[in-house]
Amino acid sequence: HTLVNGKYILEEDNINNVACQIHHKGPGSYSNVDVKSTLEDKSHLSFLCEIIVDKSAIDTDAQLTNKNLQLSKTATVVTEPQLDINTKEISCSHGCTVSNVDKEQLYALQSKGINDTDARRILKECFLDLII
């Protein structure tokens, strides 16, 4: 089993390059990659993850997720999920998203008397699952 979890908070002119490769060689193997990031100011994230499933790796379960929240128009994200699947008897999925701040959520917090800075911080922490 392979689990990769990452949470990145990028601000100012931070640059982060995330790269991983998971190679499934035997039957019944499992992997789950879950990477989230928030980006502000002129920060940049590059995410590249490759999952390789050999022909002999039947009954493999491989999941790949990358979610990114842009908190400014000048922040940038490049996300490249790659699946190299060489057998049919598997369960694999991937998904990548890049989204902006939900203005309705921001407005709802501000209507409760929370200033813009704190409202954005709350949304960022909720996105990263830092608040329960």
Model-derived regions, located:
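Conserved beta-strand/loop scaffold segments within soluble protein domains that form the structured core
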Residues: 1-114, 125-132
